[in-house]
Amino acid sequence: EGGPDGPAYSFRGLDDVGFYKRSGTTGDAYWDVTGCGNTVDATNVGALRLILDSLRYWVTEFHVDGFRFDLASALARNGHDIDMAGAFLTTIGQDPVLRYVKLIAEPWDASMDGYLVGSFPPPWVEWNDTYRDAVRDFWRGRTSPREMASRLAGSSDLYADDGRSPYASVNFVTAHDGFTLRDLV
């Protein structure tokens, strides 16, 4: 959106105060844990409805069978705190249409407390950056065979505590952020 005085490109034109999280004592500045200049307030009823209606539309009209949520921890925020039982995660997990599609979280945001690998509730699955880092280090001779085996077997140290299976881990080596595979090896 270009900041509070910039042009309106997205939600700002609909409900600027309601759709974006605010910071400061007067609430006149955007609060940003995404690195994009603002953070959608998924606890706002209107914003949550827009998100859910949009997702349902893609599922029912175009038969999309899953979604990946970039910086998904930002959507789990209630104020500045993270609430894994909050409005967005609870509602999407109980939705009669959306609970049956694949829900993939990039389980972090751009803040120090937003790293939530292994914390998203079912039916969510998560990008596993611990796997990513272990594979990259293994190629460089920096990861033990035991660590690599743990990652290949589903990272139970991250997902088994809450009863989730290895399927909760989405293993990847490179993605849209960062280096290409060629740059890494």
Task: Describe every region a protein language model picked out.
Residues 63, 84-185:
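Conserved alpha/beta catalytic core and glycan-binding cleft of carbohydrate-active enzymes
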